[in-house]
Amino acid sequence: MSSEGFVNLDKPAGWTSHDCVAKLRRLLRERRIGHGGTLDPAVTGVLPIAVGRATRLLPYLPSGKTYVGTIRFGLQTSTDDLTGDRLAEADTSHLSREAIEAALPQFLGHIQQQPPQVSAVQVQGQRLYQLARRGEAPTELPWRTVEIQSIRILQWRSGSQAELSVEIHCGAGTYIRSLARDLGAVLGVGGTLAELRRTASSGFDLNQSTPLTELLDGAAVPLLALDLPLQHLAKVQLSAETSDRWRQGQAMPVPDSVLPDAAPVRVYDLNGQFLGIGAIAAGLCKPKVVLAAL
């Protein structure tokens, strides 16, 4: 059988997420490779990679992400980070930590956010970065609902261009560049993202990640179990007879199930073999992703 599983990759700066996928395709000689959650080239950290049949499980990974980053106040750029053109500068000597703490709560919970002018968000079928390259950036960026669970201040450095280091827990689709821009706007001085590292994503943690540089130096690609990042889903275990029928596409009863309808679950046979993903409906477990076919 060809290579399959997940790779908890630590992406270096300067690489796109697509670059990482292309490199692993060559290293593993496997075409079926995808990633869970794009990282901008300048951003480092956790990039979940799915190999082989694991690509079918990407929609079921948890959506939570954690970032550690630095916001620089008194600077606005065309990309909302340091890679863009400088648009405006302001002195931030008057800015205080207390002012930051007073402003942060409005960015918590479900909020409306506009993506950066240079981003992968699509407008009328084209990505914003493609429009920006042609000088056709839209006058009005789309608003999107995102969720930020927490923002924790790690360090505050006052000065003429003050900097704030934070840890952010958020949902999928949140742009930390937009947060830096919008926080700076609320404070009246402008802001841009100076540095960002993703420390957790989709069930994977930076502490257990493998740097891409190690793989480039010849280290073996560590493939993790298909069900490793799916522990947030409830587990259903089927008997020998029902597991065979489930793998043939039949919905099977789940005894004493208290799971809500449409809830995705991990499905196993009595030997503990991971069979795939099911969905609960009226006490039945319907096959959604069958990995271990008969």
UniProtKB/Swiss-Prot annotation:
Signal sequence residues: none
Name of this protein: tRNA pseudouridine synthase B
Domain of life: Bacteria
Molecular function as annotated in GO: RNA binding; tRNA pseudouridine(55) synthase activity
Catalytic reaction annotation: uridine(55) in tRNA = pseudouridine(55) in tRNA
Record's keyword annotation contains Transport: no
Enzyme Commission number(s): 5.4.99.25
Gene3D superfamilies given in the database record: Pseudouridine synthase, PUA domain
Keywords: Isomerase, tRNA processing
Any GO BP: tRNA pseudouridine synthesis
UniProt entry tagged with the keyword ATP-binding: no
Lineage of the species this protein comes from: Bacteria, Bacillati, Cyanobacteriota, Cyanophyceae, Synechococcales
NCBIfam families named among the record's database cross-references: TruB
Family listed: Belongs to the pseudouridine synthase TruB family. Type 1 subfamily.
A Pfam family that the UniProt record links to this protein: TruB_C_2
Disulfide bond annotation, renumbered to this chain: none
EC main group: isomerase
